[in-house]
Amino acid sequence: MEVSVDISLYPLADEFIPAINEFIERVQQYPSIAVVRNDFSTQLFGDYEQIMELLKIEIKLSWEQYGKSILVVKFLG
């Protein structure tokens, strides 16, 4: 099943830009997932199972590296 996901990451830290950029750079490393960046969010397009696994890994890593953040995720399936 194909899905579209719209993600907005709001790190709760003074230095928030590195956390956002690193998250985007990591999700761009998944060859089967299309990634579109814009000013307010990042959009992912691809297989539901692959995107859910990607999110599980990358959200955890982001929180471990940069601490608390607000993450808004919208799914279109």
Task: Give a label for each model feature.
Residues M1-G77:
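Charge-rich, low-complexity N-terminal segments
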